[in-house]
UniProtKB/Swiss-Prot annotation:
Entry's localization field: Nucleus
The gene coding this protein: hlh-26
GO CC, alphabetical: nucleus
Domain bHLH: 14-65
Protein name, per record: Helix-loop-helix protein 26
């Protein structure tokens, strides 16, 4: 008996449903991690931060690199439609995420936390998971010469280094209450160069984390 056109179609409802559930789980896991990162980098519990702002602060915390929001802004230009304005804003948010994940991938490569082949194919969620483990202190191994380095609150860190700052409560913090001394791997910034590869994850955009 010949199969019906419906049964021979390339995509069944069950496969689409499974893919949708997988994507939803990935979004939920990503948002959960971003909420954890937000607790680390926010200046107060009431501070509102977008996902992109959280990522930018994590990049600065790990590598000392300040990604500037202004560099991603679109020019006002002539009067545009509401649809065009929303499209431009979404593109700006996407560009910010690409830039932030690129720097996080560089950090992973510079600190030998994964192979270059794995990093090239790595999904953004996996990038966040690795960074979260680093912050929790489970993946910090000094395989290269280290130097004690004082970190002053509110002062930028030279981007050649990858500082891992813990305060007196053993919490990772942008603004430690005391000036700690940390072990900083001496890693040349030119050791690796990771291309900016945007991995489309059909991620539903949520402006405010938490």
């Amino acid at each position: 008996m010949s199969s019906s056109p419906t049964s021979s179609s390339s995509g069944s409802p069950s496969s689409h449903g499974h893919r949708s559930e997988t994507e939803k789980q990935r979004r939920d896991d990503t948002n959960d991690l971003l909420n954890e990162f937000k607790k680390i980098v926010q200046k107060s519990e009431s501070e509102k931060l977008s996902k992109e702002e959280v990522l930018f602060r994590i990049v600065k915390l790990l590598s000392g690199i300040q990604l500037h929001h202004e560099s991603f802004s679109t020019s006002p230009g002539p009067i545009r439609s509401i649809k065009k304005i929303k499209s431009d804003r979404e593109q700006v948010r996407r560009n910010k995420r690409v830039a932030a994940y690129r720097e996080l991938r560089k950090f992973i490569a510079l600190n030998n936390l994964s192979s270059s082949e794995e990093i090239d194919k790595m999904e953004n969620l996996k990038v966040l998971e690795i960074i979260f483990e680093v912050i929790r202190g489970k993946s910090i191994t000094c395989t290269v010469p280290c130097l004690p380095f004082p970190i002053l609150p509110f002062l930028p860190v030279f981007p050649v280094y990858s500082p891992l700052v813990f305060n007196s409560y053993n919490q990772f913090s942008l603004y430690p209450p005391h000036m700690p001394t940390v072990q900083i791997p001496i890693v040349p910034s030119s050791s690796f160069e990771i291309d900016a590869l945007e991995i489309e994850e059909n991620e539903k955009d949520i402006d405010i984390v938490g």
